[in-house]
Amino acid sequence: MGIQGLAKLIADVAPSAIRENDIKSYFGRKVAIDASMSIYQFLIAVRQGGDVLQNEEGETTSHLMGMFYRTIRMMENGIKPVYVFDGKPPQLKSGELAKRSERRAEAEKQLQQAQAAGAEQEVEKFTKRLVKVTKQHNDECKHLLSLMGIPYLDAPSEAEASCAALVKAGKVYAAATEDMDCLTFGSPVLMRHLTASEAKKLPIQEFHLSRILQELGLNQEQFVDLCILLGSDYCESIRGIGPKRAVDLIQKHKSIEEIVRRLDPNKYPVPENWLHKEAHQLFLEPEVLDPESVELKWSEPNEEELIKFMCGEKQFSEERIRSGVKRLSKSRQGSTQGRLDDFFKVTGSLSSAKRKEPEPKGSTKKKAKTGAAGKFKRGK
């Protein structure tokens, strides 16, 4: 879910914090991508006649086709992607995960009813609601990435939190995900729609945290409290407080504690056993990989092993996969050129958003497990 309504709120009250770019604008940029979010998009979008792609054994292959071709497209445009996979979800997320299970069970019932009624559009809608990224999907995508020479990392917990840590450390330019809570975790730059389908023709949206805070007149801790009021994955929000009201309250009272003291409890009842303090702490001090322990490396694709996996096991067209590998190899030769703004510091524009910010005190960092294409060095 991320943060409810945050993207629209920023567009309404801090529009200068957003800019839209074509994918070509990111030539030479390293980007940390929320892998689970991307795989979910591929499972939803890469379909044939409304159904996911499958091989003869009935195994789903939509995620592999999506990962293969979208990654090649990024590389062809000079982007150097590193995929970050989710680790163990924080305990605070258990309530949200339980709600998702309930919604899936309800969607399953509605799907059966739609199938019985022969309502094709309803069947497609509820089928997509049942899409879930599994361990097998993740493992197969990791294997594919390693054969493509693309680095990936295993986060100890939430992928978007570790993506944010990589941006703050200057290891990558931006975090790419549809989950807006990447900003709540402190990512200086967030990119949306990077892995969206080309057919949708969505421009890439770039959100700059420093400009958001400046426009709202908030610091990061106050912004975190605003996000909690809007609604997050980690605790309930106060019913009856909409986005604009939440902004007004935070700007006036500066913290959730002070807001609660001044609210009419009959009109705005606070959730029972409200875990807003724990959620606040989680956003400011998440369990993340240690960016200094990570050395990112993009290497030459292993063509024959890719053919063995994608064509032999997953039954994709050999001609198409070999063509994709050629495109990938060619893109590597062109992406070695750097960006001019990596050498010259430009000030006073969105593109000069801070590349590095200090970690909050007590931030829990762990060394991430790394794929074959990503190597470790000792932390500084």
From Swiss-Prot:
Changing G231A: Loss of flap endonuclease activity and substrate binding. Changing S187D: Diminishes nucleolar localization. It is an enzyme of class 3 (hydrolase). Gene3D superfamilies: 5' to 3' exonuclease, C-terminal subdomain, 5'-nuclease. InterPro entries: 5-3_exonuclease_C_sf, Flap_endonuc, HhH2, PIN-like_dom_sf, XPG-I_dom, XPG/Rad2, XPG_CS, XPG_DNA_repair_N. Keywords: Acetylation, DNA damage, DNA repair, DNA replication, Endonuclease, Exonuclease, Hydrolase, Magnesium, Metal-binding, Methylation, Mitochondrion, Nuclease, Nucleus, Phosphoprotein. Mg(2+) 1 binds at D34, D86, E158, E160. The modification N6-acetyllysine is found at K80, K354, K375, K377, K380. GO terms for biological process: base-excision repair, gap-filling; DNA repair; DNA replication; DNA replication, removal of RNA primer; double-strand break repair; double-strand break repair via homologous recombination; memory; positive regulation of sister chromatid cohesion. The modification Phosphothreonine is found at T336, T364. GO terms for molecular function: 5'-3' exonuclease activity; 5'-flap endonuclease activity; damaged DNA binding; DNA binding; double-stranded DNA binding; double-stranded DNA exodeoxyribonuclease activity; endonuclease activity; exonuclease activity. Belongs to the XPG/RAD2 endonuclease family. FEN1 subfamily. This is Flap endonuclease 1. It comes from Homo sapiens.
